[in-house]
Amino acid sequence: MHARWIEFPSACDIRTLSERIGFFKLWGNGVPMQQTPQRGVSLRAVGIGLLCCTALSLGESYGVLVVRGSAMAADYSTGAALVLFFLLILVLNPLARLLTGSRLDSRELATVYIMMIVAAAIPSWGFVMNLIPFLGGLFYYATPENDWAHSIHPHVADWLVVRDRTAIWKLFEGAARGEPVPWSLWLKPLRAWFFFIISIYFSTLCVLVMLRKQWMENERLLFPLATLPLELGRQEPDAWLPPLLRNYLTWIGFAVPFIMYGINGLHSYFNFFPFIQLNAYVRFLRDSIGLNLRPRFEVIGLSYLLSLDVSLGVWFFAFLSILHSGVERLLGWSIGPGQPYSMPATPSVAHMAQGAMFFLVFASIWSARRHLIAVVRSAVGRGRPIDDSGEILSYRTAVFGFLAASVFAVVWLSQTGLGYGSALFYYMLCIVTFIGLARIVSQAGLAYGVSPVAPPVFTVTALGPDVLGPSGLTALGMNFPWSADLRTFVMASTATGLKIAEVTRLESRRLFVAIALAILVTLISSTWIIMTLSYAYGGINLGGWGFGGLTQLTGNWIAHNILNPEGVYGWHLVYTGMGSALMAALTYLKTRFVGFPIHPIGLALGYTYPISQIWFSVFIAWLLKAVILKYGGAKGYRLLRPFFLGMVLGAFGAAGLWLAIDAWGGNANWFTL
């Protein structure tokens, strides 16, 4: 089962070829592989990591906007990072060993992967692809009919956007062939946004430093998303490939989605190839309830790693949310209109889930209270010093860095139009949301999900449009790019990365530098490519929804709240409280009765778009794993795990391959979420 997959010639025979291949000098140092020390966060690992981060940001932006193909960096699954990491281990690392006698060791590979998953949270749905259209979109889509010129434009801070109509028109409709991007017009708002988002990233990393030991050492959260990269990064002295890639079950699992997606991809070019229909949608109760029954292979593979109670909780509460929302529609009853980013759930379902997330964060902070108090006391020099040598930042830096970054962020938000109190409420709500989603990703390993109610939307719900005023409502809308469509963000990806760093024993302080460089390089490279593509093709001609639906949805939301203020949404807050109470009861049952079969963490996910797309795949994985454990036991689970990990690689590998083919062939195949 674990036989050598392939045997290569000896590296010593052709090592001199490496001198002719400059790229592989990053690997080679003339030292035989057996004598190369474990480097960890080495200069060559960081250099290769930055190259991969740049390739990831350029490839994701071009693939989504121009090719209109599969999004590979839109969720915590970080498909782009996995594909690049897979190629690095399958092709580039063995080739480097062949040519130079040296290869990246497991710790260096971990460094590269951590940098990539952090970078994957930035270029598309994470931030930049959402931000660029906002720099001029509220002006481009203003019409006499929507009257944004009078209701919104006077309240937009000048330093947040570009008001030059020619520059905006060229961003959305394209410039003349060969005309360069007028960076002097765009640098002012871009600089303001970059300073702000870096402060947000830094503050969340500081929070993560303060919580890491509690989550990893005290509570021992599982971090299932770290499993596949750790398996890929395992090395044996005499083996060219890791054990996972020498297991035939891995390649059988790989072949299932790879062949099926390959046939569908060929069908898009050659009609004589059959099309395998994977989509299935069932409606009942007068079309008030709809079930999306499409299996997604990458979700099935990743969900196999979840514990049965967690996967049961995810699909069970999703199914209950479907029924709840459907019955409300059937009866024609609702506590209010649908809200951005919460649909297809009704507002009552969304706010119950949001209340559950609030309790999840409260319970997490409460269980960590002694550790957090000790961290703060140690940071201010009033308590017993705590060993923080394993953290990417010292506790003193984390505590005071969080405070400084928070002050900067709140002041920045207040300058956009929010009052100081509203800015503080909104900022803390975002931090709570980040902690909640990072906890879900770390504990449950679920790679897909967003906040049940977006922080800007909940701020309006809790404070009311009258308190916020037109300037505050406009400011909240302008902050949609980083705080509304939270399909991925840096904190959760870094949490997975820190687990990988703990297992591989990376040098923590040097890792922080690598992460910071990855963030900076990705921000710059993704901004450059998206601006360049927008001027070359015209934003409205590109894929994604940033230049179209996102900007228009946000403008309509701002205008509606300004022109039709409804006060504090009382029933929404009541359902939020009900969700917190239900989560508390389920948490008590789970802790009081060890055999309680459903994990309440699924309640905090609600029924947002990602959950509506993956719940059935989670159900399939839960059913398969339950049957395997029942009849094969733990041995059967371990035996078949490579099959499911291979399925993840095959799904993302096929998506990446067809993205490259479509970039040349002109068609658009979308295989990811």
Positions of predicted regions on the chain:
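Short hydrophobic alpha-helical segments enriched in small aliphatic residues
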Residues: 3, 11-13, 19
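Aromatic (phenylalanine/tyrosine) cluster motif
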Residues: 8, 23-24
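Membrane-embedded transmembrane-helix bundle of lipid-linked glycan/lipid transferases
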Residues: 33-35, 45, 344-347, 516-520, ...
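Transmembrane-helix bundle segments that line or gate the permeation/cavity pathway
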Residues: 47-403, 408-480, 487-488, 526-547, ...
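Helix-loop-helix junctions within the multi-pass membrane cores of secondary transporters/permeases
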Residues: 224-237, 492-504, 508-510, 515-526, ...
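A glycine-rich phosphate-binding loop feature that marks nucleotide/adenosyl-phosphate handling sites
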Residues: 428-429, 515-522, 645-648
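Catalytic alpha/beta core of large soluble enzyme barrels
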Residues: 556, 561-644, 657, 663-664, ...
